[in-house]
Amino acid sequence: MTQPTRIYKHSSAGTDWAALLLGAGLGLTLALQLTTVRKSDFTSFYASLASFSRLSALVGTYLAIVGIFLVARIPWVERGVGHDRLVTWHRNLGPWSLYGIGAHVFFIVLSFAGQDSIPLYKELWLSLIHI
């Protein structure tokens, strides 16, 4: 005879802790970027664009890592929040991580094209062949 399946009740405390940890991690990620900013990062429009690009890369990558963590089937996380809620969060978070990483690619290519004073399509081609 098989053992009965355990049913866990998910409290809002687990959700609150998850949101707190997510926010703290994002805050730490942004703080790491902001502590490395130099005055030279804002000397021109294209330098500022490169700084914004790095920021969007950090946020997008952080959200991608959180998305992987959400569906990693970690028992204590599933007991605290619930698998159905974690999958919903993963589904809602996925596009935003891709938008952040895509914005990074777009803005860094635009920044390099402006700094090198070459057309955008040439910089995009140079970026693609040097990967």
Annotated model-derived regions:
Residues 57-71, 96-100:
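Hydrophobic cores of alpha-helical transmembrane segments in multi-pass inner/ER membrane proteins
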Residues 81-93:
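Membrane-interface segments at loop-to-transmembrane junctions
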Residues 7-22:
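N-terminal membrane topogenic signal
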Residues 68-84:
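Membrane-helix interface/capping segments
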Residues 92-107:
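Hydrophobic alpha-helical membrane-insertion segments
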